[in-house]
Structure formats: structure tokens, C-alpha cells
């Protein structure tokens, strides 16, 4: 399928007072188009930091990130905003839905921000496949945690991003809903050829991925 994402020698250090933490140390790997990759590691191993850098939400101290061959770690301002709108989807652990919008309006929002045409048939299929058709007109406080995370997944998939990043997407869910969400991401990768990079501490969830990258002792992760 060809390479879609590449990290080269990514390093990141944080400092809090006199304490210096090396979150990432020369981290390098690549992801193929349509691949579902799970990044696993203990708490504090740097996996969420890595995800934020890959998604352009944070910058590395050293190293480069490429998406579809474009070096993104140096993008700024309007170019960075445009890149995120066109290329990146992100699923958060806490859903991050807007409480004043219905499920359908939440899914529409990134399309409107990016000035993308709304494919109503595609959205209806997404809602049906994710099992949230009945939630279409509900507000977030009227939905369960599992339903809210499915809406968040629909929102991320609606723009057809080059890469979909998921940061502990099952962290706030019970075991049944967690497995359901992991299975949904796996199907999205297989059915739509969606490239997905998921961070998780749960090895059982990671088993749904095509490939698992392990981060050990806040050091390096290599392909």
C-alpha cells in the first residue's frame, strides 16, 4: 500500500523545576497506508507524547515527522491549521463532544470547519455501521459513554483523514464497550483502508491492530 506516516529520530524532553524527563529518545518507525497500529506501554512511557507529535499537536525537540511524504514538524500558523483539517483525525479518551450540539451536529462540525462538502449518504452509513442511528438527534448528556465514543469515532472518520489518531479511546469504557470500539476501529481500517494509530495501555485492545509497537522504559520505539 505504501508508506503514509514516518517518524525519524523523535526526541522530546520536559522540565518541571529541576526535574528533567526524557519522554522520547530517538523514536523512529513508519506506518503503511491502511494499517492499524497500536502503540502500547506503561503509564509515563511517552506514548501519548508521541501521538501528539505525530498528529502535529506538539513539536519534537529533535527529529522529523512525515505524512504522505510532507515534513510536518515545522509547519506553523495557517499551513498547520490547514494540514490538520485536511489530513488528521483525532479521537480523545474523554470524547470531547460539544454539549450544545446533537450527535449529528457534532459529526458535521469538522466538515463545516474544513469547508468540505457533506455526503449525507456517507454520514448515514457511518451512523448505521457504528450503531448510533438512534442517537442522531440526542445531545451528549443523553448518551452513554459507549455511544459518545462512537459519535466521536464517526466525527473523526467523516472527514476521511489521511491518518486517524486515537489516544486511549477505550480508557473510560467498560470491557464490553471497549471491545466494541476496538472492533469498530479495526473494521474501519479494513473496510475503508483507514490508517489508524492508537495509543493504549490495554494489550487486549491492542490485539485488534495489525501491528503493535511497544515503548519500554521511556526510551525508544523502533520498527
Where are these regions (language model features)?
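ABC family nucleotide-binding domain
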Residues: 4-208, 212-215
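Conserved switch/coupling elements of ABC/ABC-like ATPase nucleotide-binding domains
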Residues: 217-223
Amino acid at each position: 500500500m505504501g508508506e503514509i506516516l514516518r517518524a525519524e529520530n523523535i526526541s522530546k524532553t520536559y522540565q518541571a523545576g529541576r526535574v528533567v524527563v526524557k519522554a522520547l529518545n530517538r523514536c523512529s518507525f513508519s506506518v503503511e497506508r491502511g494499517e492499524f497500529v497500536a502503540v502500547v506501554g506503561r503509564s509515563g512511557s511517552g506514548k501519548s507524547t508521541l501521538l501528539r507529535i505525530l498528529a502535529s499537536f506538539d513539536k519534537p525537540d529533535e527529529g522529523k515527522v512525515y505524512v504522505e511524504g510532507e515534513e510536518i514538524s515545522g509547519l506553523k500558523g495557517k499551513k498547520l491549521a490547514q494540514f490538520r483539517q485536511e489530513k488528521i483525525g483525532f479521537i480523545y479518551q474523554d470524547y470531547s463532544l460539544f454539549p450544545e450540539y446533537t450527535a449529528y451536529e457534532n459529526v458535521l462540525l469538522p466538515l463545516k470547519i474544513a469547508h468540505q462538502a457533506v455526503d449525507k449518504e456517507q454520514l448515514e452509513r457511518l451512523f448505521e455501521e457504528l450503531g448510533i442511528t438512534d442517537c442522531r438527534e440526542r445531545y451528549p448528556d443523553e448518551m452513554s459513554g459507549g455511544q459518545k465514543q462512537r459519535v466521536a469515532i464517526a466525527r473523526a472518520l467523516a472527514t476521511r483523514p489521511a491518518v486517524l489518531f486515537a489516544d486511549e479511546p477505550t480508557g473510560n469504557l467498560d470491557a464490553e464497550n471497549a471491545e466494541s470500539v476496538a472492533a469498530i476501529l479495526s473494521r474501519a481500517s479494513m473496510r475503508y483502508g483507514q490508517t489508524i494509530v492508537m495509543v493504549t495501555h490495554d494489550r487486549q485492545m491492542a490485539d485488534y491492530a495489525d501491528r503493535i509497537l511497544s515503548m519500554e522504559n521511556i526510551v525508544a520505539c523502533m520498527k
